[in-house]
Amino acid sequence: MVAEEARKEAMAKSVSGGKITYFVVASCVMAAMGGVIFGYDIGVSGGVMSMGPFLKRFFPKVYKLQEEDRRRRGNSNNHYCLFNSQLLTSFTSSLYVSGLIATLLASSVTRSWGRKPSIFLGGVSFLAGAALGGSAQNVAMLIIARLLLGVGVGFANQSVPLYLSEMAPAKYRGAISNGFQLCIGIGFLSANVINYETQNIKHGWRISLATAAIPASILTLGSLFLPETPNSIIQTTGDVHKTELMLRRVRGTNDVQDELTDLVEASSGSDTDSNAFLKLLQRKYRPELVMALVIPFFQQVTGINVVAFYAPVLYRTVGFGESGSLMSTLVTGIVGTSSTLLSMLVVDRIGRKTLFLIGGLQMLVSQVTIGVIVMVADVHDGVIKEGYGYAVVVLVCVYVAGFGWSWGPLGWLVPSEIFPLEIRSVAQSVTVAVSFVFTFAVAQSAPPMLCKFRAGIFFFYGGWLVVMTVAVQLFLPETKNVPIEKVVGLWEKHWFWRRMTSKRDIQETTILSH
């Protein structure tokens, strides 16, 4: 008994304190390029929608309204409704329809053949979409390109977070997994830089859309050389010897027997067949299922994609011109990327729940204050004075910083680490699918909501920030420094979830915390 307890304690220290090897860093940097393609797409779509030549070619009605508004500056009936076009909204949100379908298909690929094939398929699909988008001649080609991009994003978003969380030692899992959100920020920032530089070029929008092929090519080619994760090897092949060799290479030590034992035990109940989705519905996985649904939902109703998609549009609404709005969006991108980098440095020290709390309160204050400014402007014929316009930019930066070190990276990190191996792939697919559903809903609803409710849209998302901040503090256990195959035991010790989860066939660990 004493010997067994000593083994568990030694294992916990070994796994949680594992060092970061160059092999792990190189593999994770390459895999995280999946985040760059996602971030680039978010940034580029919002930017090209503020480019006159792009609107004139594909969305002439929107362009005409925009020109009329320029001639009649101060007409409060136009400012908030300029981009309320179903066709334009379809361009933005079509990606998430195909992404939803793709991520469900990616679950089977990731579960049966490994994380690496899904990453490769994501890169190939995104590359095809970038090529078609850059050469689009009509709206149909443009939307087909978006659908292909969606397939790429669906495969990448399903597989990359799993890859990062499984490759990382527990002690550094938060930092490494947050690299996915950092790469989303880098992609978003890169798109804003390119949009700003190409705005005055006749066909600059083509350059912006086609440049997405660069990160897609890197991801596609790089995935050919990626190693598979030890967790995936044991799940897909059952080859214990091969898994042990990869563990030694990943951890940089030959002392991996305890972690290998945990992987073998975790894989014993792993499904690689069509029953995986049904298994997720079992009562013992109720906490994981709930989190797979609510975390991506909460991430979207922070309102971040309203800012990401429509930041240039929002800045034009509050009084900036095309160039000024793109520059303001560029500044926002720099702030978001920097805050995510900060999150990587502190997430494994102060924990997930603390960052959720700080970021949630920060975003709440920003949303409400922006809403008040827009509401005051509405009283004065919808004209926002220049000083207030700059205040909106500052508040958006504060908001984006809050998201960048909380719901941005943690919305991907936490789901990727809380699922046991036997349902990890399918649960991650559910998480990404829910994210796509509500991203689509936000993209569809934001323009008409901004048009109809104006300031009310900011209070709407502010209300959700209150709900999610309280919910996370009450119902999410802290996973800081807990080995990934031991996280499952946290639910049995949680004040709420322990009442509805059956005892699980896992070994207890001495470092479980709440």
UniProtKB/Swiss-Prot annotation:
InterPro entries: MFS_dom, MFS_STP/MST-like_plant, MFS_sugar_transport-like, MFS_trans_sf, STP/PLT_plant, Sugar/inositol_transpt, Sugar_transporter_CS. Its main location: membrane. It holds the Pfam family Sugar_tr. One of its GO terms (cellular component) is membrane. It is a multi-pass membrane protein. Keywords: Membrane, Sugar transport, Symport, Transmembrane, Transmembrane helix, Transport. GO terms for molecular function: monosaccharide transmembrane transporter activity; symporter activity. The keyword Membrane applies. CDD domains: MFS_STP (cd17361). It is found in: Membrane. PROSITE patterns: MFS, SUGAR_TRANSPORT_1, SUGAR_TRANSPORT_2. The chain crosses the membrane at residues 20-40, 87-107, 124-144, 147-167, 174-194, 207-227, 289-309, 327-347, 356-376, 392-412, 430-450, 456-476. The keyword Transport applies. Residues 1-19, 477-514 are cytoplasmic. NCBIfam families: SP (TIGR00879). Mediates an active uptake of hexoses, probably by sugar/hydrogen symport. Belongs to the major facilitator superfamily. Sugar transporter (TC 2.A.1.1) family. This is Sugar transport protein 3. It comes from Arabidopsis thaliana. The lineage of its organism: Eukaryota, Viridiplantae, Streptophyta, Embryophyta, Tracheophyta.
